[in-house]
Every structure is written in C-alpha cells, then in structure tokens.
Amino acid sequence: MHDKKSPMANSHYLKNLKQQFRNKNLIETTIHLVKCNDHDSLAFLARTYGVPPQLRHVVWPILLKYHPMCISPNITSNTISWDPITNDFILNDPFLKSKAPTDKQDKSDDENILPYDIESIILHDLKKYFHSRSNPAGSSSNANTTNIATPTPVSSSDASTISSMEVLSPSLDYEFQIIETLKNAIVKFLLKWSKIFKYESGLAWIALGLAEWYPIYPYETMSPFNETHSFYEVEDYVVLSGRKHALLSTNNGNNGNSNSSSNNTNNNNTNITSGMHNLSINTNTSLHNSPYISHTLSYLYKEYPLPFELRSKLPTKPIFSFSALFERLALVILHCPDTILAHKQLKNDSNASSSSKANSNFNTNYFPIISGGDLSFQTQVFFKVFSSILPELYQPLTEESSLQPSSSRNSWIYWWLKCSGAKALQRQDRGRVWDLLLGWRPKPNMDTINFFLNYNDKKMDHLYHDTPQCDNEQYWMKDWIALYNNDPFWFPDLDSMALGSKKFPYDYSVFKELILRNRYGGTQSKAQKDNTVPSPGSDSNDKSELKLPFSSIDPHMQLIFIFIAILQFNEFKLLEFEEAEISEFLNNVPLLTKFDDSSYRKLYENTESSITSLPSSPTTSTMASLQSSSNSSAHISNYHMLIEVGNDAKASHCFDDLLNMAGDIWRKWLWRELEESSL
C-alpha cells in the first residue's frame, strides 16, 4: 500500500525533481560549452543560472579571460582622490599609515619592493582563515583540524571511489606553502597596481574566496607555473574547503583509521572538515595508470559529485596560474568607471548646450545607476534604496551603531560592496554572486561597451557574439535562452535603446527616454519601434534569431539590489534581533541558498557509480518539463510595468528567487525615482 503524501510534500518532491533535472542538464550543457570554448554562452549561463559548483574551477578562468573589465581594466584607487574644491588629485595616506616604517620604506622607489612591512600584514590576514593547528584545551585528534590537507594520488574511476577515500593529516610545512602561495599572488598584484591601490585586507579574503573554488599550486614559488601541469597529473593542486562549517562526526563515529587495502602503507589518517562533511580519501591507487586527482579536487567532487564520465570530458590543463587568475578577479571586483572623466564629459556637453538649465545642473545629471559609479556612489545608492524599499527595517537599524557607515576595514558595508561579499557571505552564496560578476557582459558593440567602460580605448567587440558559437547550438542553448530570455535586471524598453550612442551617451539621457516611453497614456516612439529586437527565445529555425540576452546594468549596481533583497528576505528576523545579533548577521550572513546547495550535493546520489551512457545533449522530455515549470516566473515580458516587491515564498532558499526579488526591487525603485525626478 502506497503511503499518502500531503499536497505540500508532493509539491516539494516535484520541485526537487525538476531542480535536479535542470542542474544535471546545466552541467552537461556547461561541459559542452567549455569543450567548444563558447565563452559568450558560458557567460550567459553564469549570470542567469549560475555555474555548477563542480565546474567553477574550469569555467571561471574562461569567463575572466574574456571579461571586458580584465581586457580594459580600471580600478578604484585608495592612494589618490579627487578634490572638487581645488579640481585636482590629492594623495591619500595609505591604509598602513599607523604602522611604523621599516627599512623597506627607504627602498620604496624600487619597483620590486613594497612600502612598509606589507608581507607580514598579508600573512597575518591570511592566517585568520585557517583553524589553529593546536588546541591546548583539547587533546583529541579532532583538535588538529584545518581547511586543507596534503594531496594524494588517488583513483578517479567514478564518484563512489571518491566517496570512500581517506585523508592524510596535513603537515605544517604544506599549510605554510599554501599561505605563502596566496601571499605571493597578492604581492604580485600589488607590485603591478600599487601606484593606485595599496594593500587592504579585502585582497586577502578575495584570494581566499577564489582558492575555495579554484585550485592553487602551493609549490608555485619553487616550481614556476607551467601550463602543461594538469589538474589530474600533478598531485599538489589544492582547493580550500571553507571555514564557516562546524566539524561533524562521521557516520560510524570513528576518527581513527578506516579499513583500507593492504597496499595502503600509510595508516596515519585523520578526518578534516570539507564543506559540511567529514571526508576520507584513500591513498590506495589500485587501478593501473589511473590519473592523479588533486586531494581537494576530490574534496570538491565529494561535496558536489560529478561522475567520472563527465569529469573525463573536462580540460585538465589550467589556463592561468592562481596569481594570474587572482589578478583578473580583483580587477573585476575592484572595477570602477572613470568618474572624473564622466564629470568632465558631462560638463563639456552641458557647456556646449544652449540650455542654461542644463549647464547649471550638470552635476545633478550625473547619476550613473545604469553605467555604474564609484564606491562612494554605490554606498549612497545602497542606503537610498534601503530607506525607500524597507523603511520599517531601515529606521530602527540606523539607530544602531552596527549599521553606521564606517571607514574601518571591519565594516560590513566594506565587505558587502567593495569586496563583493568576500568574508561576509558564505562560500556557496559568494560563489553564486561571483558567477554573476564574472558572467556580466554588455551588448557586443563598442558604443555599449564604452557606455559602461567610459575610459576604454581598446576595440574588443570582435571578441563577443550575440549568438551561441558552439556546434549544434540550437539543440544545446535554445531552451536555456527561452527559460531566461531577459536579463534579471531588465527594465521596460531599456533593452531596445542603443546605450552609448549619440542619442543616449549618458544615464540621464536614457532616463529621459524611459520616462517618455513608459509614461501612462504615452505612445511608443518611432525610435523604440525601430530599435525593438525580437525575443531571444522566439521559436525560429533561423540561427540569427537565437540571440543571447545581455546585461542591462553595471554588475556592481546589480549587487546593491541583491544585497537589499537579502535584507528583505530576512526582514522579520532582523526586526527581532538585538544589536549584537544584527552585527553578527551583517558580518557573517547565514547561508541563503540552502535549496540550491542541497540539490547539487545530492545530484548524483541515486545514480549508479558508473554511468553506462550519457546523452550528448539535454533530453527533450527533461527540457520540456523544465521549461513548463519555469516559464511562469522566468519568461517575463520586457514591457511589463506591474512591479511588485515581496512574496510569500521566502523559505525556498533558492538564489533564483533572490535574484528575481532583486530585479523587482530594481524596477520598482527606479520607476519611483523617475516619477519623482525633474527630467
């Protein structure tokens, strides 16, 4: 007799089933796109659906290789600032001004020497991440836990092999090598960019956040990076496993040695934390000529399983060294448009205008909500949106000292905005947020690219395409585009406007047109009719009709609305918190994407250890099921103005819900601003 399940239980089961269908097909699609180097489609999937955690170490380097902010970088400076009174740049005291100078200070003109004792401070910040190697209060074997371990050659025949592996206790020397490699990556960045950016602790946490998903080679300082080093042939690659998960006991409660083959000569095993699991990796390599898997890549595949048949399709050689990839990630996170140039251009255009009103109000016209502003502007917008969207929460929290903006590097707003969630967000949530940052792409024409990168003097539009470039792209990408045929931060008619053109050179000119087009009772302008593009997900056999949707606004502005959505998601909880609890929440945001994370962890839980056959592309039935379940929320009309904020499904713990909420907040807030403006 079958058990009767409640409608809610059945609904939850079906939701999990559909999510697993989607995730499995997303993994297969991503692997196919990686194989054919279709970075445009990979970027689309990253910013909309997110990169599967099993594949970030492969996808992120591709996204950063072609990221516009890496090809033409410009980062915020903490060494100089613009003085509007003197109309000139002034030097800022560096962050370490309170530190006593050392002998190195006299040699600061040497390009190979950093001012002050930077390296020791970097090491101090990095060591905060790792657990203590000794615990006087306890003498159990669990006291010697850490976030990394010595890599070991292992068999990689299938996912179940990794599940039964054991871990060797890491040595202090090996841990020091990892920290040293992280430090060297930061030092290399500073040596290149120190004239405009001095060291901040955020760099250490950005490096650590990257190391949680991308393998580092801890002996890089002794053995130079070689692109022939394979993730699977070199046993010393390491992926950090996170610092904010409690140590759990194993199922059998045994912290000693597990049963292993007689060929395993090392019996000194211990358990260490990896994600939310204690995990053991066996050093037995019984299969002849089996490839070597990095110890903590095995951790990654234990935490987020990936069958061997799929892993075997991945490239094994890294595109970048860890230090090179860290530089590119830092360039994206610290990116800032040239605000001084923007003010000058706006002023010159205002002076050339015959309108005296435009000339007198050129400063008020600089409101780069779409194209992006500096950190000061981002902070201003964050609190402006916060007070407008969540007034009940904003008022009591602003009375608490924990929410006050601060210049301290320990301020939560520093970690949220300037460091894009480093340190403050959980590893899983931060990875998803960084997917969005790395997947950001404007429309592939120079006018639009220069609208966002106003300082750019490089031609790069030939690197990007508005159609999928992989083989059989209709079969692989059509359904994915149909499911998410608009950028999450769409706004009515914004996608049809030629950003950066002579008609729309600045944000305020775009705002004027948006008001004109969306005014109640207004009619569609001729320009709108001429520039309206067909839906990317429209059914057509013509390849040119299969268009990728591109990003509508600056990625750092997107993060502002995502963070506001996080506050709204936890609004009732925060209203009940004491000040200390609020401070803890802001500086250590609880895991937000439990549903997504659990789905990826259990994705291949019920599959056979060895998959006999895999589809070459997503199955029609699976994608049809996925499409039918997603069209209601994801397939949104680009001209829909009924903007609602908030819903009753706050317990889903799904990033898609958070992203949709952020998009709703963006549209509601911007429309309110446009209605109240004098444009």
Swiss-Prot record:
Residues 50-441 form the Rab-GAP TBC domain. Gene3D superfamilies: Ypt/Rab-GAP domain of gyp1p, domain 3. It comes from the Eukaryota. It is found in: Cytoplasm. GO terms for cellular component: cytoplasm. The keyword Transit peptide does not apply. Residues 524-539 have a biased composition (Polar residues). Keywords: Cytoplasm. Required for replication of brome mosaic virus (BMV), a positive-strand RNA virus. This is Oxidant-induced cell-cycle arrest protein 5. It comes from Saccharomyces cerevisiae (strain ATCC 204508 / S288c). The lineage of its organism: Eukaryota, Fungi, Dikarya, Ascomycota, Saccharomycotina.
